[in-house]
Swiss-Prot record:
GO molecular function: carbohydrate derivative binding; DNA binding; DNA-binding transcription factor activity
Transmembrane segments: none
DNA-binding region: 37-56
Organism (species): Escherichia coli (strain B / BL21-DE3)
Cited function: Represses the expression of the murPQ operon involved in the uptake and degradation of N-acetylmuramic acid (MurNAc). Binds to two adjacent inverted repeats within the operator region. MurNAc 6-phosphate, the substrate of MurQ, is the specific inducer that weakens binding of MurR to the operator.
Domain of life per record: Bacteria
Protein name: HTH-type transcriptional regulator MurR
PROSITE patterns: HTH_RPIR, SIS
Domain annotation SIS: ranges: 128-268
NCBIfam families recorded: PRK15482.1
One record GO biological process: carbohydrate derivative metabolic process
Pathway(s) where this gene product acts: Amino-sugar metabolism; N-acetylmuramate degradation [regulation]
């Protein structure tokens, strides 16, 4: 029996609660392996017995049988379409509906945040915040999506009084790196940790006596080996991706935490500067 087809075609026959169940199953069929009737009931705000009755209404003995059948139907459908479906990003294909794409993207980002936060060594993080707070000058380096994360952090740090350079041009990044000195900090953002431009800048900064802080993945890399301190990020993106979406999410969680930690260190003055910035920008409207 094709339960997915039956669910799609029987909409007018469903009660309000049954329609909730049907919508859930259609939208999240790819995730059913990890979903129990208890979880479904809690999320939908209905009883478990309603889910069992729904399964029986469709001809299954219970939710477990319906769930396994739906998983089987979904897998068979994927096998048929995989030959023609184009992989757009990570696990997202051209056959996915916008609702499925939204769920996949959200879950990818949620996992990146959860796994990155689980790795935090808060004592080391506090030490890094202290080092940055004492920096005479801060350089932030990054390429592509990492450069966007760096630029966002640079704006935040400038807002609370830090002297920061964050240039997109790699030649300028290298030029700034060689001019750093002891007491300065370079924050290098690279998930792979192997981009030659970023590694070159880190080498130059370290040679000049600056402290190098790397925001990178757990993988062994040239940048990781060069850095005095590392802040680890985790991303579930596969090698095939159209953009560094969950990677950037993980990196932003780290840089936002650094910013708030720095605000907390000097809260009164930082909040005054943030307020002044807000007042000035309001005058531009």
């Amino acid at each position: 029996m094709l339960y997915l087809t039956k669910i799609s075609n029987a909409g007018s026959e469903f009660t309000e609660n049954e329609q909730k169940i049907a919508d859930f199953l259609r939208a999240r069929v790819s995730e059913l392996k990890s979903v129990s009737s208890r979880q479904m009931a809690k999320q939908l705000g209905i009883s478990q017995s309603s889910i069992v009755k729904f399964a029986q209404k469709l001809g299954a003995q219970g939710f477990t049988e319906l769930r396994m059948a739906l998983i089987g139907e979904y897998s068979a459908s994927r096998e048929k379409t995989n030959a023609t479906a184009l992989h757009l990003h990570s696990s997202i294909t051209s056959d996915d509906s916008l609702e499925v794409i939204a769920r996949k993207l959200n879950r990818e980002k949620e996992l990146a945040l959860e796994q990155t936060c689980a790795l935090f060594d808060y004592a080391r993080l506090q030490k890094i915040i202290d080092v940055i707070s004492k920096a005479q000058f801060i350089q932030i380096t990054g390429l592509g999506g990492s450069a966007l994360v760096g630029r966002d952090l640079s704006f935040k740090l400038m807002k609370i009084g830090y002297r920061v350079a964050c240039e997109a041009d790699t030649h300028v990044q290298a030029t700034v790196s060689q001019a750093l000195k002891k007491g300065d900090v370079q924050i290098a953002i690279s998930y792979s940790g192997s981009k030659k431009e970023i590694v070159l800048c880190a080498e130059a900064a370290r040679k000049q006596g600056a402290t190098v802080i790397a925001i990178t993945s757990l993988a062994d890399s040239p940048l990781r080996r060069l850095a005095h301190f590392t802040l680890d990020t985790v991303s579930g993106e596969t090698e095939w991706r159209s953009s560094s979406m969950s990677t950037r999410t993980a990196q932003n969680s780290v840089t936002d935490l650094l910013f708030v930690g720095l605000v907390q260190l000097n809260d009164v003055e930082s909040l005054k500067m943030i307020q002044r910035s807000s007042e000035l920008t309001q005058r531009l409207k």
